[in-house]
Swiss-Prot record:
GO molecular function list: rRNA binding; structural constituent of ribosome
Keywords: Methylation, Ribonucleoprotein, Ribosomal protein, RNA-binding, rRNA-binding
Name under which the protein is recorded: Large ribosomal subunit protein uL3
Organism: Rhizobium johnstonii (strain DSM 114642 / LMG 32736 / 3841) (Rhizobium leguminosarum bv. viciae)
UniProt keyword Secreted present: no
Recorded family membership: Belongs to the universal ribosomal protein uL3 family.
Length: 213
């Protein structure tokens, strides 16, 4: 099991494959993705690497973190994430990981924070059909209707689909295909959509499940 990477979402575009078909892709950019610290079985009880990416201003970095970066001999990083790895995949502190870490055609799992939509109704949040447009319905056209309970059980069950806060959740999309990489510019092109807004930090790992045949 090897380390994943930290990348930043640039946006979406489309590219053409060898068959001349256009493929929608999300462009991710890697900037200064380096190993900041390591975790070992002897010292920590498990094996992992801590990666840092992006550039943070020194004045915005705490004194404790400045000390950690100084020990690793790397510039202050804007984003830190820890990845569990096997002992044979443990990287040295200061090692930089580039876009060539992934190969075209391989499958990856991508983790990001979805775009927040605020308080949303049941129609937008869950795809409900709403109530009738006429025939006695007034004001409640976009309502979710009955919550489905009466004296017994006398309550609304947890996880009932209702209006509420939508988005701004941590989501992992599995088995996305890497279309191509550009190591010189630090770009990874991933087929399809990736959770998060433009500029959001994205975690990319090797896929843990095989794709459905």
């Amino acid at each position: 099991m090897r380390s994943g990477v930290i990348a930043q979402k640039v946006g979406m575009t489309r590219v053409y494959n060898d068959a001349g078909e256009h493929v929608p892709v999300t462009v991710l950019r890697m900037e200064g993705c380096q190993v900041v610290a390591t975790r070992t079985v002897e010292k920590n009880g498990y094996t992992a690497v801590q990666l840092g990416a992006g550039q943070a201003k020194v004045k915005n970095t705490s004194k404790a973190m400045r000390g950690n970066f100084a020990i690793a001999n790397v510039e202050p990083k804007a984003k830190l994430t820890e990845f569990r790895v096997s002992e044979d995949q443990l990287l040295e502190v200061g090692t930089e990981i580039k876009a060539g870490h992934f190969a075209a055609g391989q499958l990856v799992d991508v983790t990001g924070t979805t775009i927040g939509k605020g308080f949303a109704g049941a129609m937008k949040r869950h795809g409900f059909g709403g109530l009738r447009a006429t025939h006695g319905v007034s004001v409640s056209h976009r309502s979710h209707g009955s919550t489905g309970s009466r004296q017994d059980p006398g309550k609304v069950f947890k996880n009932k689909k209702m209006a509420g806060h939508m988005g701004q959740t941590r989501v992992t999309t599995q088995n996305l295909e890497v279309v191509s990489t550009d190591e010189d510019r630090g770009l990874i092109l991933i087929k399809g959509a990736v959770p998060g807004s433009k500029g959001a930090w994205i975690i990319v790992r090797d896929a843990v499940k095989s794709a459905a045949k």
